[in-house]
A protein has these predicted regions:
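Thiamine diphosphate
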Residues: 49-125
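Flexible, low-complexity linker and terminal segments
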Residues: 2, 11-12, 202-334
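Conserved thiamine diphosphate
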Residues: 3-4, 84, 132-185
Length: 334
């Protein structure tokens, strides 16, 4: 059992709007850290700019509230400089996928050992309600008064397209699932991306309404667990089967279909084909996938950097800057 609990990671009084999804997520993060049992002084929480990026102020850990869109780059430096540090990088959909989109995909591609959290409310909240890279087509906002005329990013596609090895999704109001996703992300060696679906009660309330309540998730979501059949529904009466190159929803008990016919989730499969199809499912025809969708191990960037440094040092006659200066002839200028 961990010697720490959620209280050990709490600090300050959050200043988010009442009902903001950030409150729910913060509670899940505190609880996950308590169960992981990592000492607060061995954790750094690094954020960019936005409502969600105030999160480091409410953590009794090291933290850095950085600049717009650059938290992944700064988190990279922290992790490479101190590989023993557990680094959480937190951003919203605007901060993380617009100005920070390039840093996001390259941190994932490099497989830096970062726990990357994307709080997705499909809106710019701090700047008072402009559409973001994840806002749906036709969304009316202060910066799109007649509706957007572009399709949104889907975070899972970005992660998979950048050759990501870990992707999970949870809902801010679902404490148990969020805690399990965060713990799995922390235990994963390499870049882990966890998308957190949450509402902005002021500027985009109800954007994830179909899965924001327990009753809604029972009807409209599927919880994926590695090695378990993909079954869902209020009475676990539906399942997923393969149809051609796609998926289909079937009702267990009809047309001779049993639980044995249902696809089994394999989060550890290196091939992303089925995992991506699961991550991109959406209503009303399919349930929204929650839980750990992909979890594959690979060599991390920070490990490779330090291994290379040691290899080069071993082959050189000098091992630090001082020795380098003294390697060749030295003269004194008077």
């Amino acid at each position: 059992m961990s010697e720490y609990n959620a209280q050990d990671y709490k600090f300050g009084q959050p200043r988010w709007c009442p009902g903001c999804g950030d409150h729910f997520f913060l509670g899940a993060l505190h609880k996950a850290m308590g169960e992981l049992g990592i000492a607060p002084h061995n954790i750094a929480v690094i954020s960019g700019i936005g409502c969600s990026s105030r999160l480091p102020y409410y953590m009794n850990t090291y933290g850095f509230h950085t600049i717009h869109g650059r938290s992944a780059a700064i988190a990279t430096g922290a992790k490479v400089a101190n590989p023993d540090l557990t680094v959480w990088q937190v951003s919203g959909d605007g901060d993380g996928l617009a100005i920070g989109g390039n840093h996001f995909i390259h941190a994932v591609r490099r497989n830096i050992d970062l726990n990357m959290i994307l709080l997705n409310n499909r809106i710019y909240g701090l700047t008072k309600g402009q559409y973001s890279p994840t806002s749906v087509r036709g969304f009316v906002s202060k910066s799109s008064p007649y509706g957007t005329v572009e399709d949104p990013f889907r975070p899972a596609e970005l992660c998979f397209g950048a050759r990501g090895n870990f992707f999970a999704r949870c809902v801010a109001t679902d404490l148990a699932s969020a805690v399990e996703c965060l713990k799995a992300a922390a235990k994963h060696k390499g870049a882990s991306v966890t998308e957190v679906l949450q509402n902005c009660v002021i500027f985009n309330n109800g954007t994830h309404e179909s899965v924001y309540t327990k009753e809604g998730r029972a009807k409209n979501a599927i919880y994926l667990e590695h090695g378990k059949p993909m079954i869902f529904g209020e009475n676990r009466e539906y399942g997923l089967m393969q149809e051609g190159f796609g998926l289909k929803v079937v009702k267990i008990g009809e047309n001779g279909i049993t639980e044995n016919d249902i696809l089994v989730h394999d989060a550890h499969c290196k091939d992303t084909t089925l995992q991506l199809k699961l991550a991109l499912m959406e209503g009303p025809d399919f349930p929204i996938a929650l839980g750990v969708i992909r979890d594959v191990e690979a060599v991390t960037y920070d490990e490779a950097v330090h291994a290379q440094v040691q290899e080069v040092k071993a082959a050189k006659s000098y091992h630090n800057f001082s020795e380098l200066l003294e390697t060749n002839e030295i003269w004194e200028i008077k």
